[in-house]
Design a protein with these regions (language model features):
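Conserved nucleotide-binding/hydrolysis modules and their immediate coupling elements
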Residues: 209-314
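Canonical P-loop GTPase G-domain recognition
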Residues: 136-194
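Conserved nucleotide-binding/hydrolysis micro-motifs of P-loop NTPases
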Residues: 19, 81-82, 105-108, 132-138, ...
């Protein structure tokens, strides 16, 4: 019988370059108490890849987790470019909702649309966070209209069109449910997440099922599979069956040697984890994205989200010259 994990929320963050999603997550980490008051928080904590730090874009998804009151909030950063579509779709498979971060001056930008379209297609709940409202040229009311127009263009359903709006300055450390509210802290955003993002659900008594959505690597333990437990539970030293996503008839019996959950930016070893939790497992040398970790007695794979094929677009034109020239593909 399916039950909800009311103590967990799983969300992804969508934003255009430089609209402030990394600063927003940094501030949530600080104000949730995930980082101690005397602990230094590195700038751009979610930009772990060298190219990401240099360019300010997100290519690989990162996992972090914060605790607000009695609720654990797993936050996953998403790539913003259509070029990394496969990464986007795999990430969204793990969450029940998204936070759309939009600059209060720049408004909706092209990089936002691709990921938002995927989220809407998967019927995920949406919270819109209009960030940088402290900019002198901020125009939040106009940006609200732009966002609603975008939702309509992307065929959002009625519930998605009725999504909550939060107004924030991540840099200054505050969020508001209304533009006239007091500029105090990030609590309005925390409350909005807990109240509007559905809790993950699954059957804790059913056979174990966990879809591997991303792969991490550690030089000491090797490949690490990351995903959400959809049904059942996982334990250290538990024997499970890996079902190959290309051919469900290919199965391999393995043992979970280490099991991790996330706290802040760290992986924390645990002995057991249940439905709705985003976890990492090690000890499986040839685990791959799209594989399903299953119970031995009922190895049923979870359908793998169809990944958009990489695309390359090119515009070619001839320069006006007096004599015809042959255009050759080299």
């Amino acid at each position: 019988m399916k039950t909800k994990r009311e103590d967990i929320r799983n969300i992804a963050i969508i934003a255009h370059v430089d609209h402030g999603k990394t600063t927003l997550v940094d501030e949530l980490l600080k104000q949730s108490g995930t980082f101690r008051a005397n602990q230094e928080v590195a700038e751009r904590v979610m930009d772990s890849n060298d190219i990401e730090r240099e360019r300010g874009i997100t290519i690989l998804s990162k996992n972090t987790a914060i605790t607000y009151k009695d609720t654990k909030i797993n936050i996953i950063d998403t790539p913003g470019h259509a070029d990394f579509g496969g990464e986007v779709e795999r990430v969204l498979k793990m969450v029940n909702g998204v936070i759309l971060v939009v600059d209060a001056f720049e408004g909706v930008m092209p990089q936002t649309k691709f990921v938002l379209q995927k989220a809407l297609d998967m019927n995920l709940s949406v919270i819109v966070c209009i960030n940088k409202i402290d900019r002198p040229e901020a125009r939040p009311e106009e940006v609200i209209d732009e966002i609603l127009e975008l939702f309509i263009d992307l065929d959002a359903n009625e519930d998605q069109l009725d999504c909550p709006f939060i107004f924030a300055s991540a840099k200054s450390g505050y969020a508001m449910a209304d533009l006239n509210d007091e500029k105090k802290d990030m609590q309005p955003l925390f409350d909005c997440i807990v109240n509007n993002i559905p809790a993950p659900e699954g059957d804790p008594d059913a056979d174990t099922q966990m879809l591997i959505s991303t792969i991490d690597y550690n030089e000491f333990v090797g490949r690490i599979g990351v995903g959400k437990i959809d049904n059942g539970s996982l334990k250290v030293n538990q024997e499970v069956m890996i079902v190959n996503h290309h051919d469900p008839s290919v199965k391999k019996r393995v043992r979970i040697t280490k099991l991790y959950t996330f706290n802040g930016l760290n992986k924390v070893e645990v002995n057991e984890a249940g439905i709705g939790e985003i976890v990492a497992v090690s000890g499986i040398a040839d685990i791959h994205i799209g594989d399903t970790i299953c119970s031995l007695n009922n190895p049923v794979a979870i359908p793998f989200q169809k990944i958009s094929e990489p695309t390359l677009s090119m515009d070619l034109s001839l320069i006006h010259i007096s004599e015809p020239t042959r255009l050759q593909l080299i």
